[in-house]
């Protein structure tokens, strides 16, 4: 357990940021699963709208520092390839 006041504050801040990051990552995974389901079901229109949502979510997560920007770019690229393979 921390004894110094600033260390105690850092523990609180870390817990808060951990919860926020977990929420963003969970939402991101949910949106990606929705896109994957649309691709698996050969639903092109639904896949296109889901892809826009995935792209936006990845950009937000990358800008907030929740995920690395290269990881976001890689995911977007791979998901775009899946979308283009459908059409």
Swiss-Prot record:
Could you tell me which Pfam families the record lists for this protein?
Answer: Ribosomal_S20p
* Gene Ontology CC terms: cytosol; small ribosomal subunit
User: Could you tell me the keywords of this UniProt record?
Assistant: Ribonucleoprotein, Ribosomal protein, RNA-binding, rRNA-binding
Q: In which domain of life is the source organism classified?
A: Bacteria
Biological-process GO terms, alphabetical = translation
GO molecular-function term, one example from the UniProt record: structural constituent of ribosome
Instruction: Give the family this protein belongs to, as stated in its UniProt record.
Output: Belongs to the bacterial ribosomal protein bS20 family.
What function does the entry list? Binds directly to 16S ribosomal RNA.
Please give the PANTHER family that the UniProt record associates with this protein.
30S RIBOSOMAL PROTEIN S20, SMALL RIBOSOMAL SUBUNIT PROTEIN BS20C
Q: What is this protein called?
A: Small ribosomal subunit protein bS20
Primary gene name: rpsT
